[in-house]
């Protein structure tokens, strides 16, 4: 199941894909694809050329919008992490007795970190102690160069109220 994004609704697919911060690895895919939102031809050409060089045989790569103007080193590091994740899945599959869950998509808070946290992020506020631990572990394993202050908001006001984020929801659900 793929979550709805922007104008795209939820989709169900049998294609395996492993999303990274900048790249999506498709272990049984083919080719190098670039996000349509990257619209400068020079950047598309740069990413396509890099993708051809670094793509493992028999796989497909999709460069996400976030890969625009990102250094080759960070893109390669992202791909290496995805390849390692795929190898771990394959190893677990070899030793597991079906039925068994061998991989799970990241929870919502980790998707937010993956997609929105960058080198300019200095603070993340979370209202769940367990989610803070998962977030710290995620950053240690995936974004080791980021230094972020995690603030636990669980004992304070509701996080959406504190940052005045409820108004758009209230007007949407209470028309008139």
Question: For the regions a protein language model found, what residue spans apply to each?
Answer:
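DE-rich acidic low-complexity regions and acidic surface loops
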Residues: 1-176
